[in-house]
């Protein structure tokens, strides 16, 4: 939702394209569940705003996928619901959360919690964490090549 949705789109682009300009590699499959405005608005209208991420997740999620949930409050109901769906499919979940981690904390396999009340600081840390983790992923890929 909001800035976290923008962060999700930003980070998924890093997986599909690349993080560092000096590295050429195959694209890594990634999608932001917040990127398709037609699906989001249709789902919000026809079902409920709390289900906007569930419908695409249910259609796209496969065994061995990883779901990264990004929310500054940790309490976004639409994120909580998709995390519950991921758990029922035995999909690994990583939470980029803020504050105390909120309701999402108990549905994530790995919690990266920024203990702040400042939305801006939380979002800045989420992007840093996303870049740092992905840099490690790229390094692992390069070692295997």
Task: Show which residues each predicted segment covers.
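Glycine-rich phosphate-binding loops that contact phosphosugars or nucleotide phosphates
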Residues: 4-143
């Amino acid at each position: 939702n909001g800035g976290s949705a923008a962060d999700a789109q930003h980070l998924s682009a890093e997986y599909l394209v690349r993080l560092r300009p000096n590295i050429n590699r195959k694209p890594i499959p990634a999608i932001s569940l917040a990127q398709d405005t037609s699906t989001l608005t249709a789902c919000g209208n026809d079902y409920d705003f709390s289900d906007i991420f569930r419908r695409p997740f249910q259609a796209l999620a496969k065994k061995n996928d990883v779901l990264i949930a990004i929310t500054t409050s940790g309490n976004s109901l639409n994120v909580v619901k998709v995390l519950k769906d991921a758990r029922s499919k035995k999909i690994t979940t990583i939470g980029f959360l803020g504050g105390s981690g909120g309701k999402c904390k108990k549905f994530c396999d790995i919690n990266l919690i920024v203990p702040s009340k400042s939305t801006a600081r939380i979002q800045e840390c989420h992007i840093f964490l996303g870049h740092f983790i992905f840099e490690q992923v790229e390094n692992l890929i390069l070692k295997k090549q």
